[in-house]
């Protein structure tokens, strides 16, 4: 075993790099006394919840105001001096110290992007110092469960400039025995879908998350396309592969109504609409079916269809334990989307997942629409045995990087590797 001093933080560096949308983001590097290095890059969302932790942006004219040099300076001038000399193995203390220094409810002083970059880079440095893969360092010897991928193959809403209000239409290959087999099935359907779109004269241009962004008139039209693509690829909808939606309802919720597909719907009407979709399509998961502060509506939605499908709170919970506790108390959902940059530290992310599990909720580890080559969430999904991961479509290398990392983990685990499959989905299979 190395001496304790070997795990002490020596220096922390940071820089401004670009994400998959060409927008600036923060990269941090944590250097330990033993020579180990950890590097992490934070992602950024397009449809962001009002209650998310605060991203620090520069404003001004450079990069259309989206620069992050101020966040980089916060790391160099404030975070690094405070953390140098501390043990990288004490992740909780490091994260809590950054939260304390920030001193705001939403991390608006130091910025969640600067805090998270250091938090994740520190975990990487510690795992490298111990010569452990990140999933093993963050997890335990039983961390061998590969997640079911929720693959966003048709993009709409804030992720694509087409006529679809629903933001994501996803494939969920669950009825197989291995992650690699699930990935193969999803990939084959993705290419089947592309051929279908070409034959119908529809665009095969892709959106932010690598899914296609055709001009379609309704969610039903997208659902029908996916069913046809699944069957043409030789699979059975609802058996090997099901569907999932991210409605991102907050994006079109105005003045108490859901402005959806040319209609103005009440909360009750939106619930009826979603219930009909579940009856007509093999949907196993719906994310953000209602707006982030429509708490009464969420409880009604959960009562209506929560025993049939997974109801995932993204903007509703923003990976925040306070909002999650309220959701548990009010029975507002049965699942939480986990985005590390919504809350801003690894420790708080893990706390949210623990709370969700204690309440019988599922957790879905998720990317953001503005992603990078960083693969931390792949390791996190295995470390926590989450059972599900959202990391985009089967194109764009920032999405594929996570899938490839999971393939390597599966190979590394060998005979010990398990695939979540049907048991990874909620609520009826929890």
Swiss-Prot record:
Catalytic activity: (2R)-2-phosphoglycerate = phosphoenolpyruvate + H2O
Origin: domain of life: Bacteria
EC numbers for this chain: 4.2.1.11
Record text on cofactor binding: Binds a second Mg(2+) ion via substrate during catalysis.
Keyword rRNA-binding: no
Enzyme type, top EC level: lyase
Alphabetical list of Gene3D superfamilies matching this protein: Enolase-like C-terminal domain (3.20.20.120), Enolase-like, N-terminal domain (3.30.390.10)
GO molecular function annotation: magnesium ion binding; phosphopyruvate hydratase activity
Keyword entries, A-Z: Cytoplasm, Glycolysis, Lyase, Magnesium, Metal-binding, Secreted
InterPro entries: Enolase (IPR000941), Enolase-like_C_sf (IPR036849), Enolase-like_N (IPR029017), Enolase_C (IPR020810), Enolase_CS (IPR020809), Enolase_N (IPR020811)
GO biological process: glycolytic process
Main location: cytoplasm
Cofactor(s) needed by this chain: Mg(2+)
Keyword hit for Membrane: no
Function: Catalyzes the reversible conversion of 2-phosphoglycerate (2-PG) into phosphoenolpyruvate (PEP). It is essential for the degradation of carbohydrates via glycolysis.
Protein name in the entry: Enolase
Organism name: Prochlorococcus marinus subsp. pastoris (strain CCMP1986 / NIES-2087 / MED4)
Gene (name only): eno
């Amino acid at each position: 075993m190395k001496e304790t001093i070997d795990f002490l933080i020596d220096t922390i560096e940071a820089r401004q790099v670009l994400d998959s949308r060409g927008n600036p983001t923060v990269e941090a590097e944590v250097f330990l006394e033993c020579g180990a290095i950890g590097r992490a890059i934070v992602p950024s969302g397009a449809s962001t919840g009002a209650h998310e932790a605060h991203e620090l942006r520069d404003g001004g004219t450079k990069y259309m105001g989206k620069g992050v040099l101020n966040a980089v300076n916060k790391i160099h001038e404030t975070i690094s001096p405070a953390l140098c000399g501390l043990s990288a193995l004490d992740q909780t203390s490091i994260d809590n110290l950054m939260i304390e220094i920030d001193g705001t409810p939403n991390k608006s002083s130091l910025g969640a992007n600067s805090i998270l970059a250091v938090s994740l880079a520190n975990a990487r440095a510690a795992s490298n110092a111990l010569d452990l893969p990140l999933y093993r360092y963050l997890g335990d010897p039983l961390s061998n469960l590969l997640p079911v991928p929720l693959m966003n193959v048709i993009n709409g809403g804030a992720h694509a400039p087409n006529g679809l209000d629903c933001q994501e239409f996803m494939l969920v290959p669950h009825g197989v025995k291995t992650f690699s087999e699930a990935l193969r099935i999803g990939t084959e359907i993705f290419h089947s879908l592309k051929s279908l779109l070409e034959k119908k004269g529809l665009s095969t241009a892709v959106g932010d998350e690598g899914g296609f962004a055709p001009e379609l008139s309704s969610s039903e039209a997208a659902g029908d396309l996916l069913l046809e693509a699944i069957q043409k690829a030789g699979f059975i909808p609802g058996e090997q592969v099901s569907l999932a939606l991210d409605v991102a309802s907050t994006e079109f919720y105005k003045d108490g109504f859901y402005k959806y597909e040319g209609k103005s719907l009440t909360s009750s009407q939106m619930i009826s609409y979603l219930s009909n979709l579940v009856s007509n399509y093999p949907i196993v998961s719906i994310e953000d079916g209602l707006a982030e502060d429509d708490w009464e509506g969420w409880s009604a939605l959960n009562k209506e269809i929560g025993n049939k499908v997974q109801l995932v709170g993204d903007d509703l919970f923003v990976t925040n334990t306070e909002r999650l506790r309220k959701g548990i108390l009010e029975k507002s959902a049965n699942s939480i989307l986990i985005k590390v940059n919504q809350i801003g530290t690894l420790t708080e992310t893990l706390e949210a997942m623990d709370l969700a599990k204690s309440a019988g909720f599922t957790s879905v580890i998720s990317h953001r629409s503005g992603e990078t080559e960083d693969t931390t969430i792949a390791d996190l999904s295995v470390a926590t045995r989450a059972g599900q991961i959202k990391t985009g479509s089967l194109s764009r290398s920032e999405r594929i990087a996570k899938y490839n990392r999971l393939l390597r983990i599966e190979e590394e685990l060998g005979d010990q590797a398990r695939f979540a499959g049907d048991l990874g989905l909620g609520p009826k299979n929890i």
